[in-house]
Amino acid sequence: LKAGAALMFLDTSLPHALITHMLEDAEPAAILTRGQANFRDLPTIDVLVLPARSQSRCEPDWLDDPEQCLATLFYTSGTTGMPIGVESCHAGYVNLALTYADYFELMPGMDATTLTSSLGYDGSISEMYSAWVAGCSVVLLTKEQIRAGPDLLPILRDTEATVLFCPPVLLSTMTVSPEIGLPYPLCRYIVPAGEAFP
């Protein structure tokens, strides 16, 4: 992102046909990997061997308006049955992150948000960037932790997460009655999104 390039997170657990469709549609210049020599015959860049600091300190000269420049490409489920690419610009990231950080009154050293979404889902932006712009931590929950049902509650307490972003169905796995059955205090905010509340 700092180089002015657009980023597309790729969930490699998706079916082969969906990954193929997204790669053919997006036509990425390179795939960032961790030690992987190649990925589907596309050029790869091993992030484990990149220098810690960039040598260049200036913006790429081809950026006309950095705020409106494409930052990320997300793929939705799409009504056609195949994922559809949706573009997010840098200004959109910043506006969303600042709005969330302000709304939740995030305080550095006191608050931490959770990341329950896949990085390939647009909701991950609000989960991560809202904390980062406020100087707060992000609690990265594994798939196993997210699916832990009632056992997720002590994890949230131990990590001191104060804002839980989650699909509503996650709340119903933690307790039969999410409206009244969650222990207090759990988080300052619970933000169900992505589907109808059960």
Protein language model regions, located:
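Conserved helix-loop-beta element of the AMP-binding
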Residues: 29, 43-54, 93, 113, ...
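Conserved AMP-binding
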Residues: 11-12, 117-121, 144
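Phosphate- and divalent-cation-binding pockets in alpha/beta enzyme and binding domains
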Residues: 18, 39-41, 173-176, 193
